[in-house]
């Protein structure tokens, strides 16, 4: 089953002229909509069709990659794996120097950096499949830097993730994301 859930990025992460506190409060509401309403509905629908609870994998490209990673890293109790393609995993690009409790809570680079090495989530992460991928071609520079930063944090915390940097011909574009999904999905589904 595939569920595609729209974001409110034009009001939140992409609304760089808006009040930062208001923007992140809206995003936090969206986050809770996903984990408090959508996830239980997915389990309900999957249970009706399959008579059992199904694993859930957040997946996204570009800004969706950040959302997928954030959902997974904040709630590994709800998600079994994550596929994030060409994402930014920190708040710098959208919020600049602004930081408060909610921005911190929604910036994987920040909250994973601050996570103690004996935090129970680290064991949970290591029991799941994590793939972060970025190209090194056109429009990927900021994303490549952010992916490098989060890779450093994941490595330092002992979090086993497949962080993959594709070639210099791999652009920030749908054609490449289709190829990456085709490449990674068998691994995530246990077919490889």
Language model: regions and residue ranges:
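Non-catalytic cap/lid and distal C-terminal segments of serine-dependent acyl enzymes
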Residues: 1-192
């Amino acid at each position: 089953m595939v569920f595609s859930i729209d974001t409110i990025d034009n009001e939140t992460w992409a609304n760089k002229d808006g009040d930062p506190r208001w923007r992140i409060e809206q995003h936090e509401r969206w986050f809770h909509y996903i984990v408090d309403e959508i996830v239980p509905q997915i389990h309900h629908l999957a249970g009706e069709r399959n008579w059992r609870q199904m694993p859930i994998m957040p997946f996204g490209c570009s800004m969706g990659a950040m959302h997928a990673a954030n959902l997974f890293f904040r709630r590994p109790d709800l998600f079994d794996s994550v596929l994030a393609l060409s994402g930014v995993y920190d708040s710098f690009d959208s919020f600049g120097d602004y930081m408060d409790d909610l921005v911190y809570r929604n910036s994987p680079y920040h909250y994973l950096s601050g996570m103690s090495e004996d935090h129970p989530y680290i064991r949970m992460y290591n029991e799941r499949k994590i793939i972060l991928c970025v190209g090194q071609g056109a429009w990927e520079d900021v994303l490549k830097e952010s992916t490098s930063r989060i890779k450093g944090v994941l490595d330092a915390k002992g979090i086993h993730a497949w962080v993959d940097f594709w070639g210099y011909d791999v652009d920030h574009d749908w054609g490449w994301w289709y190829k990456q999904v085709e490449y990674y999905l068998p691994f995530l589904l246990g077919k490889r």
